[in-house]
Every structure is written in structure tokens, then in C-alpha cells.
Amino acid sequence: LDSASYNGFQFYAHDKIKYRPKSLLNSIFIEPRQIYKDSARNLTRNHLKSLKNFKLVKLKYNELNSDELTASILLTPLKKYSIRLNTEAIHSNIKQLGFSGGFSFLNRNTFEGAEIFKLSFQGSIFDISNNTGSDDTPFNSWEVGTDASLEIPRFVFPFLSNKIIPKNMGPKTVFSLGTSFQKNIGLDKQKFTGIVELSWKSTPRKTHTIEMLNAQFVKNLNTNSYFSIYSSEFNRLKTIQEEYFPDKNISTSNALTFISDEINTAFKANHPEDYQTAKNIEKRYDILTLNNVSPSISYAFTYNTQFDFKDNDYFFFKAKVATSGNIASILAKTEKDGVKTFLDIPIAQFTRADVEFKKFWKTSSASVFAFRSFLGVAVPYGNSDEIPFSNSYFIGGSSDIRAWKTYDLGPGSSNTGLEFNVSNFKFINSLEYRFDINRSFKGALFIDAGNIWDITSSKLTTADEKFTGLKSLENIAVGTGFGIRYDFNFLVLRLDLGFKTYEPYLGNNKWFQNYNLQNSVLNIGINYPF
């Protein structure tokens, strides 16, 4: 039996005391020689559970005499180490078929202060539909990544004292590092991420999160294969070449040279639409192949009335503002063309703001109405003319507008037919009626509506891609459909079939023109879309 005394508290352990008393007291709100309060008891229990170090937290009170109590807190620790393995089958419009596997290692109470260290590895192999053609071997595409994080149940920076954020708000610091590498997936992206995050709860329903640093380094290793990978874009250029420049030769290796040499002011005067198509392809090349460093800071506020995961009648609101590159640009190197770089990589400067609202109504013991609305805007400035691809908005997919595949819709009323359509303004709403079929099988009827637009003054985007005011809301796409879900208790397997109901890029008649099984989209997802 081991024991210790600290600040009027006695600590006992069957073996050695493995938690620093000072660290545990950060989660204990029962004070010696103070009047008993239910609020202090509940706060203590909840905070100790939130440490994710104990499988059992039990509080006991015994009477000493008529006006005094002794309080005992019994803690049963979880195993210090845990290992988890996972496997997954993957299917999408980009990755036709794939398999992934992961391994994660968890170390609780890493430094005897209830910290949690997590190290994970993930690997995937895919059969890619838009392969470069250099290797036709099945499953020749892969992605590997590793992440490490340290969660500390307190603030570690001396300028953030308990006087600023008191311990009853559950202050937390998280450090994380991650990296991933791809082969034969798109442009073979290399990505490194480092995050320093602070969070606390001002009330049980209000959460504040500050990312003091979210640094992302993105490098594309296979930009020379761009037009082999994004073949639809090359085919559009090929059509322009064959119609207007039959004496010219164009290949995937000289497509950019063709644009710069032939798609000039004179061509624009005679063929404005095809000029715009070529320039859009050039712009998308710049966005998708851009190597960048994005050192951002952000603040997020979340208001959530959900009591626990079984609560189906609640309200959720989240607002987040992030800005990238401001401090780093001061310290950066300025090149001859005025571009500021770090390690010869341009620094991305932009501001992004997102607002999300969700409301759930429990209409009976076996049915729920769910509503979700999202609005997001990202504006480049200073060192950047475009938003990095990873910070841009897309539309479509299993958790978005389910009648369109990921990246297939927008911007606006345009219908580019190109891969990976992204932009800098997004608005989406979804309404879903969820009901039980039996104990495990669930059903759903849904309607999704939204789109992405361009809100910059760029001359390279067409009028049908831009958001110009309320009139642009006419270009909101609408999809409807139904879903079947199976509840495994620990996750929900979801099959949603979406039908194109209103297509903003069509002519005069935009309603129900492709409302059929042939043009529907089957979405396979894990858990609910929102």
C-alpha cells in the first residue's frame, strides 16, 4: 500500500501511486472544510471520467458526526497500454476498390499526469480508375501515413493560468504531428501536419477551441502526369486543338505549352467560350499542383445541447474562423517575383470562416427529423491568388448532396465535366426523416440542397461560377432519395440512394430531367451523414 498527502487530500494505492496528486486535483472540486454541494460532486465525477484514464469513478460519503462528512473517491484505472487494429474496404468514384489497415498504440498516464499518448499507422492499397497508364498492375496505388498525438488535461503554457481559464472548465492541450505519402494516387501528394490545440468548456454546452498553430506542408511529387491523371481535361484541350489548330500536336506532356502559346487574346476574340474552357483548365492545374505551406491559427465555438449519444432531440451550432500565413509571411523569404516562401515553398495566405447548424426533433420513440445547414467562405489575399486545394470547398458525396458524386457538382450553374471541382464559397442544407424498420435496420428519406460558388474577383472564372447575390441561389442543386442503415451499436452502416431532382446547369427545364435509377448515385457510408 502506497500513500501520499497533498493540499489536505490523502491518496492511497494498492501498489505504487502512479498519478501525480497535483494532476488529479485539477479534476477534483470537492474542497476540505467546505459545505457539501451536489454540483461539486457531479463536476468531479464528470471531469475524472473525461480524463479517459479510468474505467470506474465512484464517489462515497460517510458521516463523521452530525455536521461533517468524509469524501472518498475510488478510481479504477484502465490498462496503461492498449493496441487497436482495424481494416476497411473502400469504394468511391475516385478509388474504384481499395483496402486499408491500421494499427494504433495508446499509452495512458504517459508522464503520470493523466496524459494520453497515441501513435497510429495507416496503410491502404487501391485500384484507381484514372490511373496514369504507366502501370496497369491491379492495386498498384497505395497510401501510408502515421500520426502521433499527446493529450494533456491542462494548459501547459504559463501565460494561461487558472485565473484566466479555471480548472472547472476542463482546459486541455493537444500536440499532434502527422505525415502521409501517396503513390499513383492523383499527384502523389506528400503531406506533413503539426497542430497545437487548446480547448475548454465555459459551460457543459459551450466548447471553445483555439488552434495556436495548424501548420500544413503539401508537396505534389507527380505534377508531370497531371494531364494523364485528369484525362477529361486533356480531352477538352484535345478537342480545341483538333478544331482550331489541326496542324499542331498536343500531348499530355505539352498541354500547358499549348495553352500559353495558342490560347491568346486573338483566340479569345473569336472563340470566347473555348478560350474560357482552356483558361479554366490552366487555373485548375495551378490549384491542384500548388505546393504550399499553410501555417494557420483558428478559433472555434461549439454549442451542443445533446446530453449523450442516445439523445435524439437536441440543437448543435459551430462557428470557426481561421487565418493562414500572416505571422509566417513576416519571417518568410521574398523571391524576385514578390512571392514569400518558406523552404522555397510559397506560403498560403487566406481567411476562412465556417458556420454549421444542426437540429434534431424526436417525433416518436422510433423516428427523428434531422436538419443540417452549413455556410462557408474562404478568401485568399496577400501572397495567394487561390485557396489551396485542401482548404477549398467541394460538393457532393455520401455526407453532402448525395445525388452527385464527390467533386462532380458546381461551381454555380457551370457543368465543366472535369474532375475535382472546388471553389471558395459553399452553402448546403439537408433534411432527413429517420425511422426504425426493426431493432437493427433503419430507414431514411432525405432532401439535400446546395452548391459551391466563386466569390473572388478572378477573371478566370466564368459568370455562371460566381456568386453575385441572392439571384445566385437559383443555382442551388437539389437531390432527394432514401436510405437503408444497419445499426451495429458501435457504428452504423449506411446505404443512401440519391436522385438528381433539380440540376442548375440544365436549360429551361431543370426539374426531374434525370430523376431515374440510371442517373442515381449509391452512397456507402459509415454512421449518419450529419
Residue spans for each PLM region:
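Second-shell loop/turn segments in exported
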Residues: G8-H14, I28-I35, D135-D136, L343
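Extracytoplasmic/secreted envelope proteins and their assembly/folding machinery
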Residues: P21, L25, R41-R45, D354
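C-terminal soluble interaction/assembly domains
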Residues: E31-K37, N107, A463-G469, T480, ...
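Flexible hinge/switch segments at interdomain interfaces of large molecular machines
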Residues: D2, Q10-L25, H271-Y275
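Gram-negative/organellar outer-membrane beta-barrel architecture
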Residues: I17-K18, K37-K318, R402-A403, V492, ...
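Outer-membrane beta-barrel domain signature, especially the mid-to-C-terminal portions
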Residues: S458-N475, N508-Y515, V521
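C-terminal outer-membrane beta-barrel translocator/porin domains of Gram-negative envelope proteins
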Residues: F9-Q10, I90-K95, T209-F435, F446-A449, ...
